[in-house]
């Protein structure tokens, strides 16, 4: 069965390369495993509830980032994204705290 990918766009170029090729340059080596799990969850999700996985600490962002969601990667590092109509957009890998 052919499955459509949910992830449609990236802000962070190294995260995109990691997603497409598995090459982890540009992402912290100690974050690679968690990012791989989170990207896989995003890419198979149909709803935001599908991504509410223990350990990911999924939560909506507020203020200027309203409309975006966040996964905790490690410490202050987050995977942030918009989720609209069953697709993930503008994925970013950032230390935003």
Regions found by a protein language model. Give the residues of each.
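Arg/Lys-rich, positively charged N-terminal/basic patches that mediate binding to nucleic acids
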Residues: 1-38
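Enriched for short, Lys/Arg-rich terminal
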Residues: 1-5, 62, 70-97
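A secondary-structure boundary/capping signal
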Residues: 11, 54-57, 92
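Generic structural signal for secondary-structure transition and capping sites
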Residues: 23-24, 44-47
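Short, electropositive, low-hydrophobicity segments enriched in small/polar residues
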Residues: 26, 67, 79
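Basic/aromatic-enriched alpha-helical hairpins
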Residues: 38, 43-44
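A short, surface-exposed loop/turn module that caps and links secondary-structure elements
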Residues: 46-69
């Amino acid at each position: 069965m052919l499955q459509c990918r949910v992830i449609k766009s990236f802000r962070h170029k190294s995260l995109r390369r990691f997603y497409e090729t598995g090459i982890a340059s540009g992402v912290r080596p100690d974050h690679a495993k968690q990012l791989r799990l989170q990207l896989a969850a995003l890419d198979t999700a149909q709803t935001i509830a599908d991504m509410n996985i223990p350990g990911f600490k999924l939560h909506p962002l507020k203020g200027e980032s309203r409309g975006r969601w966040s996964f905790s990667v490690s410490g202050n590092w987050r995977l942030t994204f918009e989720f609209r109509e069953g697709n993930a957009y503008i994925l970013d890998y950032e230390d935003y705290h």
